[in-house]
Amino acid sequence: MAVYTDIAEDDLKWFLSEYDAGSLLSYKGIAEGVENSNFLLHTSKEPLILTLYEKRVEKTDLPFFLGLMQHLAARGLSCPLPLPRRDGALLGSLSGRPAALISFLEGMWLRKPEAKHCREVGRALAQMHVAGDGFELKRPNALSIDGWRTLWEKSEARADEVEPGLQHEIRGELDFLSAAWPKGLPAGVIHADLFPDNVFFLGDQLSGLIDFYFACNDLLAYDVSICLNAWCFEKDGAYNITKGTAMLEGYQSVRPLSGEEIAALPVLSRGSALRFFLTRLYDWLTTPEGAMVTKKDPLEYLRKLRFHRQIGSAAEYGLSL
């Protein structure tokens, strides 16, 4: 979450009047994340999250995101719910941006997740994949294999400013993945951004998943690879196989991976590492100074990508074959 667009208190009060949400008591911006402008509101009824959708988010995608949250919650997944306006619409407008009010989810994200937490995340991810079955709206993944080269071209000219030799290395990686990317694996709705700051815990109990604004239709095992990258590496860059084992066992306790998915996991993990490297690289080079946003180091994901190149089998991630 982040803040790119400021809001005036009078405008916010007018916006709230379109909802049965009580009167405004206080509000503050939330700096974490990189996509939308987010605020924590306290009203006379309940705490809420206000999201202003910035230019990177297509307005035509919003019915998918908001409808998916409703669909998943109706099937028992703990996730935020969009609040309807008095006229029944889920979307309004504030400060020249599409805007929505979302229910507040209790919990905090973990700064130092342990293996037991990774197991819970794996289980919750599989539950989301199962619950997403039957959701009728579709959204292709613009940040998967077909979109990476276009994204790379936006940063390629300056890439060697971040690390010498990057241009050559990433061109080669794109060529490899274009040839090796698996086809025909089980697909469905994926979260596509299930990082620690998008999973809330109360103590050791997972209390919910948040931030569905990258959700889309893609390979389910690709979502698993995103979580391996996001949860199972230590701050020194080392892969923690104990966490990986817990993550994969948790996932398979709900939805067992097929043999084809298991065989593809090293390539999928290279791809998901490249995806986050590319978006971080672009943001690193283009985010304006002074924006109330946390920029993330692209080289973290370059190191993960290099790790995955050395992997020969999913057993090296901790998966029992």
Swiss-Prot record:
Its EC number is 2.7.1.39. InterPro entries: Aminoglycoside_PTrfase, Homoserine_kinase_II, Kinase-like_dom_sf, Pseudomonas-type_ThrB. One of its GO terms (biological process) is threonine biosynthetic process. GO terms for molecular function: ATP binding; homoserine kinase activity. SUPFAM superfamilies: Protein kinase-like (PK-like) (SSF56112). Pathway: Amino-acid biosynthesis; L-threonine biosynthesis; L-threonine from L-aspartate: step 4/5. It is an enzyme of class 2 (transferase). Keywords: Amino-acid biosynthesis, ATP-binding, Kinase, Nucleotide-binding, Threonine biosynthesis, Transferase. CDD domains: HomoserineK_II. It catalyses: L-homoserine + ATP = O-phospho-L-homoserine + ADP + H(+). Gene3D superfamilies: 3.90.1200.10, Phosphorylase Kinase, domain 1. Belongs to the pseudomonas-type ThrB family. This is Homoserine kinase. The gene is thrB.
